[in-house]
From Swiss-Prot:
GO MF annotations, alphabetized: aromatase activity; flavin adenine dinucleotide binding; FMN binding; heme binding; iron ion binding; NADPH-hemoprotein reductase activity
Classification via InterPro entries: Bifunctional_P450_P450_red, CysJ-like_FAD-binding, Cyt_P450, Cyt_P450_CS, Cyt_P450_E_grp-I, Cyt_P450_sf, FAD-bd_FR_type, Flavodoxin/NO_synth
Family membership noted in the UniProt record: In the N-terminal section; belongs to the cytochrome P450 family.
Stated name of the protein: Bifunctional cytochrome P450/NADPH--P450 reductase
Swiss-Prot/TrEMBL site (Important for catalytic activity) positions: T274
Gene name as annotated: CYP505A3
Organism: Aspergillus oryzae (strain ATCC 42149 / RIB 40) (Yellow koji mold)
Reaction catalysis annotation: 2 oxidized [cytochrome P450] + NADPH = 2 reduced [cytochrome P450] + NADP(+) + H(+); an organic molecule + reduced [NADPH--hemoprotein reductase] + O2 = an alcohol + oxidized [NADPH--hemoprotein reductase] + H2O + H(+)
Enzyme class of the recorded protein, top EC level: oxidoreductase
């Protein structure tokens, strides 16, 4: 019985402008991003029109499965591919259906890509891959690797050698082969030309002239290769011989000279461009997901070990195969396919999709957004956006519905070079994981795209360190060894220990795991101290210690715990450490651990440092001293760290290795020359520049100020709802002026900072050996408001020797726990103490040395990329309060970052970067999932983004008829003081409420009518029946705010849970069913842990 036809509905889409249509809705640099955003807004199908030409964009598996039916639809050459026909005419990828040259070439070339021929290319693939391995081995672990560039060299040289017997020798030149520049130029310009009217493309512009020059270069190069082969024939069964000598088994015809050139260019481009992108994405995914990286490397170790890889090994790497499948699912490097109604087989009039729901125009093509189709949650589940290779192992991959994975195209027009690309990718990944440990150059890097007609990561750098037992000198011969020689070599050549940095200094290694810079600052602080104890300390990220923890001196691990997870630059180390096996593999290591955490994350408080401390010890290492811990919720973490170092770590090092203290002499840390009349700014950052578009005050007088800032993001930067924006701030000018005044510096003073001696601190985060404006130094490089530590007090006391009364006072504060606690509680900084005690005679060099480096601050993004992916907003409170350390009543305590942000104006530039949320703190993919959001004050920020995202989806999908009348309920509980004064974003939320995106329930703690105030937890308890019903129907709960808000909401949820639990227990007892014996606290904690695991209860708590 056939399904009744659906009622046709209009195909939705953005409104265009006259003549140009939707051309302005499509980004010029990364068109894919805007096309996918429109799919999120308008649903599984939408229509675009440019210059009178329309096409439908498809983003769901259900509709894609229809148009992949080759009885109804066939490949359509349009947009950028149509423009490429100027260069490669009717080659395999650009031919229209029915063109004779395509049919001949397809039948001639298919045998060249048969399994045996591909396997016979293995040795040549291995030869080029060896060149890549040796380049990275010789560069060493400090070298930043531009991943896409070197993978481009690899794949271009591989296709040239294997398919055409030609060596481009790309690894022997700093510059890319001219073929690459011409290819990129042609592909990019073809895409640009496809978005312009034909008249403009015929104008003699610089870009158009370069386009034709690139085409000429590519064709002439291939003509030269063909002519050389014809003059020097060979029996090699490669692609070039097939092109020249092959005959069509159906017609007996050979390929024409022009067709040979067309397809040579096609294969040189297709044979390397997409594979280099896929390899780059694969390594990005593995480095972002340490567990997957660990499994892939363990598979290589288990299957291949240290011997030379063989072609037979590639069939025994199911996990690496899954990594590649999952990579191509998330980021198909050829991101779209165009189809149109089959001109001879499809007799529908009109042509429809969705069982008659969507009516296509006559001969209207459809473009399939493969990335969206392959991330369809109806096929891949709610975690469809996440990288999980396990879903692509054979047992799961083979059960996928038809057409759910299409990165190589469809049917007759699918990529015939797939076996070649697959063998090459598996070989390269296996060889690299066999020989190197990798880490991102910037662990906070999130994927950015570069698009021509294909996509690649942009600005993606990593570092490669040879694995334990390998060195560059012997690796070349080991790679060509036939069997066990590689393994024998590895066993015989261990890594050399770190060299001593001076005749009397012993080696020491300090590893840090840090996202915000606190633990890195501690690591450098400890390394600075090491010289005076007789050690030369190397400071590296924790990931650098993976696979090779040194045994030639003390090793210190300093790491934070972020919501129970390791920092970005410690994730691979932690994964490796957790998987260590064998009998005491870390025997001979002498270590200590210092950890940071935040007490509001009770269930995961200090989890990572404690686990590192336990696991390193359990694997045979010697623990030098007890773990040191600092709660970042307290202001005085520096003193906690210094105390641990002075009372635990350094005495333990002396006991184990002997004392080699080089002094307690009170010499200045820096020599400083002061001059004026110059201003120099030097700032080395791993952030990018954003532009302030708008800075708006959201509150009225009488309440703490809250603002929202809209930023224009750096090119290629992407974000998702729930992500953070990291900002590098500048100290308030009033605070900087206090420094200038205290040290009697004129406003234009210039400092030149040098090390006082060669053994002075090596780990400096300020400009050295160059002139820098004193104002810039104190404004941008250092933290001026950090509470003073006990060590700071000791330095100040020594500098107050001329005033015994002040000296005694400072010593008393340091030694009295109650008085010292006030330093943290009142946020009294070194600068505050210098102002309070003017007789302290502190050298400016010592003052600079006491200041920690400026760190970034993270703010929840309060916008949705569906509105504009090139912009994002933050919403924040401005911290401005009476100073508890004030010398006068007029003094105020100013939040460093919030003050800086509040003073920004439109057009000003800011150093920033997007940081992903490490939890499930993101809105549901589907509008059918209910939401409960609770916040107070600026905790509203991420929820504004969530609701904005829902509103855009609702508007788009309603216009397409692809969603029910009402989406699932989304309730927002928002705490504020007084209606009309600080109920921020009220107008926007009211508009979104009208379309059903949210229900806003405000709790006013200080109502204007003088009535009793309420808080979000009070409103939630009033609505408990509704909330329990929502939760039992699948709702997700989100909480954002201070610890007070988080704890209060948690208590409300606990109360509701226990009430509902008691009701369920009563009913069960009445039915004679068993009930749990857990006490109430245990039952609630189990429930909460389960909800967190399922990402149905997530929090974002800030100080």
């Amino acid at each position: 019985m056939s399904t009744p036809k659906a009622e046709p509905v209009p195909i939705p889409g953005p409104r265009g402008v006259p003549l140009m249509g939707n051309i302005l809705d499509i980004e010029s640099e990364i068109p894919l991003r805007s096309l996918e955003m429109m799919a999120d807004t308008y649903g599984p199908i939408y229509r675009l029109t440019t210059f009178g030409f329309s096409r439908c964009m498809i983003s769901s598996h259900e509709l894609a499965a229809e148009v992949f039916d080759e009885e109804r639809f066939t490949k359509k050459i349009m947009a950028g591919l149509s423009e490429l026909r100027h260069g490669i005419h009717d080659g395999l990828f650009t031919a229209h259906m029915g063109e004779e040259n395509w049919e001949i070439a397809h039948r001639v070339l298919m045998p060249a890509f048969g399994p045996l021929n591909i396997q016979n290319m293995f040795d040549e693939m291995h030869d080029i891959a060896t060149q890549l391995v040796m380049k990275w081995a010789r560069q060493g672990p400090k070298q930043k690797i531009m991943v896409t560039d070197d993978f481009t060299r690899l794949t271009l040289d591989t296709i040239a050698l294997c398919a055409m017997g030609t060596r481009f020798n790309s690894f022997y030149s700093e510059e890319m082969h001219p073929f690459v520049d011409a290819m990129v130029g042609m592909l990019k310009t073809a895409g640009d030309r496809s978005r312009r009217p034909g008249l403009v493309n015929n104008l003699p512009t610089t870009e158009n002239n370069k386009y034709w020059e690139d085409i000429d270069y590519l064709r002439n190069l291939c003509k030269e290769l063909v002519d050389t082969r014809k003059k020097n024939p060979t029996d090699k069964k490669d692609l070039l011989n097939a092109l020249i000598n092959g005959r069509d088994p159906k017609t007996g015809k050979g390929m024409s000279y022009d067709s040979i050139i067309d397809n040579m260019i096609t294969f040189l481009i297709a044979g390397h461009e997409t594979t280099s992108g896929s390899l780059s994405f694969a390594f990005y995914n593995m480095l972002k997901n340490p567990q997957a990286y660990q499994k892939a490397q363990e598979e290589v170790d288990r299957v291949i070990g240290r011997r030379r890889i063989t072609v037979e090994d590639l069939q025994k790497l199911p996990y690496i195969t899954a990594v590649m499948r999952e990579t191509l699912r998330l980021t198909p490097t050829a991101p779209a396919i165009a189809v149109g109604p089959h001109p001879t087989k499809n007799h529908e009039d009109p042509v429809t999709l969705g069982n008659g729901k969507y009516v296509l125009g006559k001969d209207e093509p459809c473009a399939l957004l493969l990335g969206k189709i392959q991330r369809d949650p109806k096929v891949y589940g709610p975690d469809a956006e996440e990288f999980k290779p396990e879903r692509m192992l054979d047992e799961h991959f083979n059960k996928l519905p038809k057409h759910a994975w299409k990165p190589f195209g469809n049917g007759m027009r699918a990529c015939i070079g797939r076996p070649f690309a697959w063998q090459e990718a598996l070989l390269v990944i296996a060889m690299l994981l066999q020989n190197f440990n990798f880490q991102m150059d910037d662990p906070s890097y999130n994927i950015q795209l570069k698009q021509t007609l294909t996509i690649k990561p942009n600005h993606f750098y990593m570092r490669a360190a040879l694995r334990e037992g390998l060195d560059a000198v012997h690796l070349g011969s080991a790679l060509s060894a036939s069997s066990s020689e590689h393994a024998d070599h590895a066993a015989g050549h261990g890594k050399a220990g770190a060299a001593k940095k001076g005749a009397d200094l012993k080696p020491m290694h300090v590893y840090y795991g840090s996202n915000t810079g606190t633990c890195e600052a501690f690591a450098r602080r400890l390394a600075d101290d090491a010289t005076s104890y007789g050690y030369s300390a190397e400071v590296e990220s924790l990931d650098s210690a993976k696979d090779s923890i040194p045994k030639n001196g003390p090793v210190v691990f300093i790491t934070a715990s972020y919501e129970g997870q390791p920092p970005d630059n410690a994730a691979h180390f932690f994964e490796w450490l957790s998987a260590l096996k064998g009998d005491k593999p870390l025997d001979g290591v002498n270590y200590a651990v210092f950890g940071c955490g935040h007490h509001d994350w009770q269930t995961t408080f200090y989890r990572i440092p404690k686990e590192v401390n336990r696991l390193v010890g359990e694997n045979g290492a010697n623990r030098l001293c007890e773990i040191g811990l600092a709660d970042t919720a307290n202001a005085d973490i520096v003193t906690d760290f210094d105390t641990w170092g002075e009372t635990s770590f350094w005495p333990a090092v002396a006991a184990k290795f002997g004392s080699n203290t080089q002094g307690s002499q009170k010499s200045s840390t820096f020599r400083v020359e002061v001059s004026s009349g110059h201003r120099a700014t030097t700032l080395g950052l791993q952030l990018q520049e954003g532009l302030v578009v708008e800075n708006t005050l959201l509150t009225q007088a009488g309440v703490p100020a809250k603002r929202t800032i809209r930023f224009k993001l750096p090119t290629d930067t992407q974000y998702k709802c729930g992500d953070y924006l990291a900002i590098l701030p500048v100290n308030p000018s009033t605070v900087v002026r206090k420094v200038m005044s205290r040290f009697d510096l004129p406003w234009d003073a210039v400092l030149r900072i040098e090390k006082a001696s060669p053994s002075s601190s090596k780990h400096i985060s300020i400009p050295m050996d160059t002139q820098v404006s004193a104002y810039d130094l104190f404004a941008t490089y250092v933290e001026l408001s950090q509470p003073a530590s006990k060590r700071d007090l000791a330095v100040l006391a020594d500098a107050a020797a001329v005033d015994p009364e002040t000296q005694a006072e400072l010593q008393a504060i340091a030694s009295d726990p109650a008085r010292f606690a006030e330093i943290s509680q009142k946020r009294i900084s070194v600068l505050d103490l210098l102002l309070q005690y003017p007789s302290i005679n502190l050298a400016i060099g010592d003052f600079v040395a006491m200041l920690p480096p400026m760190r970034v601050r993270q703010y929840s993004i309060s916008s949705s990329p569906l509105v504009d992916p090139t912009e994002c907003s933050i919403t924040f409170s401005v911290l401005k309060a009476p100073s508890l350390a004030a010398l006068t009543k007029e003094d105020e305590y100013l939040g460093v970052a919030s003050t800086y942000l509040s003073e920004l104006r439109s057009g000003e530039r800011v150093q920033l970067s997007v940081r992903p949320s490490h939890t499930g703190f993101k809105p549901p993919t589907e509008l059918s999932t209910p939401m409960i959001m609770a916040c107070a004050g600026s905790g509203l920020a991420p929820f504004r983004g969530f609701v904005m995202d829902r509103a855009e989806k609702i508007r788009g999908r309603r216009s397409s008829g692809s969603m029910p009348e009402q989406p699932a309920k989304a309730i927002l509980y928002a705490g504020c003081r007084t209606q009309g004064k600080d109920d921020i974003h009220a107008d926007e939320l009211a508009e979104w409420e009208k379309i059903g995106a949210v229900e806003v329930r405000r709790a006013y703690s200080r109502p204007s009518d003088g009535s009793k105030g309420t808080h979000v937890q009070d409103l939630m308890m009033e609505d408990k029946k509704e909330l329990i019903d929502l939760f039992e129907s699948g709702a997700r709960i989100y909480v954002c705010g201070t610890p007070g808000v988080g704890n209060a909401v948690r208590d409300s949820i606990k109360s509701m849970f226990l009430e509902r639990r008691e009701e369920i227990r009563r009913i069960a007892k009445e039915k004679g069913e068993p009930v749990s014996d857990d006490d109430e606290e245990t039952a609630f904690e189990k429930f909460l842990d389960d909800m967190k695991t399922k990402e149905r209860y997530t929090t974002d708590i800030f100080a």
